[in-house]
Amino acid sequence: MAYGRRYWRRRRWRRRGGRWWRRRRPWKTRWRRRRRRWRRRRYGRRARRFRRRHRVGRWRKLFRRVKSRVVRQWDPNVTRRCMINGYDHALFWGQQAQHRILYDNLPWPIKKEGTQEGGSMNMMQLTLQFLYKDNLAGRNRWTRSNWDMDLAKYHETTLLFPRHRNYSYVVFITRGPNDILDEHTYPGLHPEKMLGRRKKIVVWSKDLRPHGKNYIRVRVPPPQVFKNQWYFQRDICQMPILTLGFAAFDPVNVTLAGNMANSSIILWGIPYWSRPMPYNTWYDYWTKCAGPQNIPWSDRQTNIAAGITQKSAQTCLKLKNKHFGLTNTAIVSDYDKDNIDKNTKQIKTIVMSLNRWYPKWPMKWKDAGDINTQTPFPYRYSWREDQGWGNKVRLWTRECRTDIPEETLGIENMPLYVLMNGYIDYVTNHSTHSPLNWVVSVFCPYTDPPMTNVIPVGKDWFIQNVEPGENKYPSDNADNTFAPGEKTKIKNYDSSKDEFTGNVIRAPDVYDSLPAQQALYIASPFSLKWAQTTGSIVFFYQSKWTWGGDFPRQRPIIDPCNRPKWGGLPVTGYDETGLLLQNPEKAEARARGHLGDLRRGDLTKTALKRLMELTSTEEGSPQKKKRRDKEVRTTADLLRPEDVYCWMSPTPETPPKAGKTPESSFAETYDNHTKLAKRVKKEIHNQNRRHRLLLAHLRRERDRLLGHHLLR
């Protein structure tokens, strides 16, 4: 039946689902044009003329429909869905340990009484091996066992963050495969940096938000590198499925703590080297340029020694601006040779000079007979003045060197309180450098005075590590306490020490910079102040997995009278529900065949290559004899005895040795080559035996898989 140009009449039924880019309607109906409702004309008014306007749709470019790709994937014979439900410690910190980093993925050593533990910041990676260790510790429960299941498929993880009564914290979640922990990671865990992230989760405390839910639930899909396919458990057991970062913060006391008058703090430090301290001794500079305006101590009026004359200001200015060169390999003046360890080449008793450690440090006194230990240099710092650009924090070696000290793990161009956040914790827990052989060097132009290669220490560092010498300051002896000319004695006096200096017991190390890290954290924005002494925060998770394996569904029937009795202690892998768990890191399943390895009754090339790469140490591989070390053999060693004389080049005749005839020499040579031939034959036989074992293993796997396929 022809309709002429009205070609649209030929299709009486509409296209299934309408246009391909539209969603199909869930109901079945015919397309009818809705009639316009006409209102009844009122009397006394002129009828309004209505003109129907046909609606014209917007012009759209027609795209070709992209066909979906068909992915054909083999599934194992047996699959088991497993839900891993558990909890873990997000944050916990002891008294005055807010500035520390909680390393949850590291084994915790047993702490002594009074030692700081934990931290208010943490970063952890969830892996399949991490979930298995949590099960051994009793922190999660597996609904299905992975015993005899060599394959795994990851689906998702649901996280639940409960609200704490007193503390608020911020969380970030990443699914990238390149989330590595280095020296640049932990400065980003500072609360100010965490709150400035684009993607974050802020969990407010119940004191600030009394209403609302008591938890925040987050669903985390698989990482970008994970495909919806089966993996061997051993291959993905160490691959992070997600990375979590936690940081507790104080939204009430943002800038100042309860006992702080302003945002400025005092940092104490020792210069690693200083131009006013020449390469030979500090005493050299003292004698050449003395005076309160030239001595770099905080309390200059109390550092004037008797008997030292004041030099001109021009001489002092030249001495300050002089560029002192590096020392040679010889021992510096006023150094004791016994002060340097011959094995480690480190100086035992030290205080700094230019690229050298100087064992003597000036003391100061207030009155006759009263000696106070000199404090380190004070540096005033405020986070409001710190712009970040130009700051540097790095590790320097403590070795006695004649060149520029070795430098490593340097980070820069961030505020000082961000650079020092977690830096010492990273060095002591993650780096390969010993904290006792390195020092933390800080370069910050925003302090007063600027810190130029300064080692931050505590204020009482010299009190703990300096043994004072003898005070020779003249006394007026107003109360006739001392006899005329008598020297003032102090505690622990040693006549071998200098008369107006103290002897330093040891050098500073990485641990001595912890007071500076704590002071910077407490004075920084959004940090936990002194009022919050201890705290603990946990989170809950539910991870969804699927285990896969290839054992027959229909198990053979066994005589019950021949079944062995179960006795003895339970296996370690059992949990409280009786499930037998297997360590995914040690589950080597490459020696096992699967139904996906068969193609028309034979093994595929991929499966054959995987089985050929097995070694005798892997679980499930065919056992074979230990391989002997290959010996370097020449062509003559591989020849038969009867072919030796045909191949060997003629040699000059030599007289036979005493007691040996040509016939006996020939017999000895023949016996040696016969032994070589037997050894070569035995080696070839062993090699063929290994091939036969491998082929027999392949045939057994093929027959087993064919049998499982028929049982299905």
Swiss-Prot record:
Its main location: virion. Self-assembles to form an icosahedral capsid with a T=1 symmetry, about 30 nm in diameter, and consisting of 60 capsid proteins. The capsid encapsulates the genomic DNA. Capsid protein is involved in attachment and entry into the host cell. Belongs to the anelloviridae capsid protein family. InterPro entries: TTvirus_Unk. Residues 670-706 form a coiled coil. The lineage of its organism: Viruses, Viruses incertae sedis, Anelloviridae, Epsilontorquevirus, Epsilontorquevirus calli1. The keyword Coiled coil applies. It comes from the Viruses. Pfam families: TT_ORF1. Transmembrane segments: none annotated. It is found in: Virion. This is Capsid protein. One of its GO terms (cellular component) is T=1 icosahedral viral capsid.
